[in-house]
Amino acid sequence: MNPANYLILSALLFTIGTVGVLVRRNAIVVFMSVELMLNAVNLTLVTFSRIHGTLDGQIMAFFVMVVAAAEVVIGLAIILSIFRTRRSASVDDVNLLKY
């Protein structure tokens, strides 16, 4: 498959993730949209790595996946904390954590 197709797919995935972050108010959906954006970046890194014949992009994609795994743990803990106190997973309730 042509590498340009992978880059187009990556741009499409990133755009869908961006729209999800900007439009949705549910914290879980926003969180999934951010993960979709990270996966789009991973696809771009691996595609450029494949084009240039090096492993640098694949190694960077691996580190992005490790950081995303840590983000999942911390993000879900914060969302769970908000849900337990407000019984809602809306991002409008984020100011709750100030107190």
Curated annotation (Swiss-Prot):
Which UniProt keywords are present, listed alphabetically?
Cell membrane, Membrane, NAD, Quinone, Translocase, Transmembrane, Transmembrane helix, Transport
**Native organism:** Frankia casuarinae (strain DSM 45818 / CECT 9043 / HFP020203 / CcI3)
Give the location in the cell.
Cell membrane
Main EC class of this protein? translocase
The UniProt catalytic activity note for this protein reads: a quinone + NADH + 5 H(+)(in) = a quinol + NAD(+) + 4 H(+)(out)
Q: For this UniProt entry, what is the primary localization, expressed as one broad class?
A: membrane
Protein EC: 7.1.1.-
Topology relative to the membrane, per the entry? Multi-pass membrane protein
Q: Which GO terms describe its molecular function?
A: NADH:ubiquinone reductase (non-electrogenic) activity; quinone binding
**Which Pfam families does its entry note?**
Oxidored_q2
Q: What protein am I looking at?
A: NADH-quinone oxidoreductase subunit K
Q: Name one GO cellular component term.
A: plasma membrane
Q: Which domain of life is it from?
A: Bacteria
As for what it does, the entry says: NDH-1 shuttles electrons from NADH, via FMN and iron-sulfur (Fe-S) centers, to quinones in the respiratory chain. The immediate electron acceptor for the enzyme in this species is believed to be a menaquinone. Couples the redox reaction to proton translocation (for every two electrons transferred, four hydrogen ions are translocated across the cytoplasmic membrane), and thus conserves the redox energy in a proton gradient.
> Which biological processes are named by the entry's GO terms?
ATP synthesis coupled electron transport
UniProt-listed PANTHER family: NADH DEHYDROGENASE SUBUNIT 4L-RELATED (PTHR11434:SF21), NADH-UBIQUINONE OXIDOREDUCTASE SUBUNIT ND4L (PTHR11434)
Quaternary structure, per UniProt, is: NDH-1 is composed of 14 different subunits. Subunits NuoA, H, J, K, L, M, N constitute the membrane sector of the complex.
Gene from which this protein is expressed: nuoK
What sections of the protein cross the membrane?
Answer: 3-23, 28-48, 59-79
Q: Which family does it belong to?
A: Belongs to the complex I subunit 4L family.
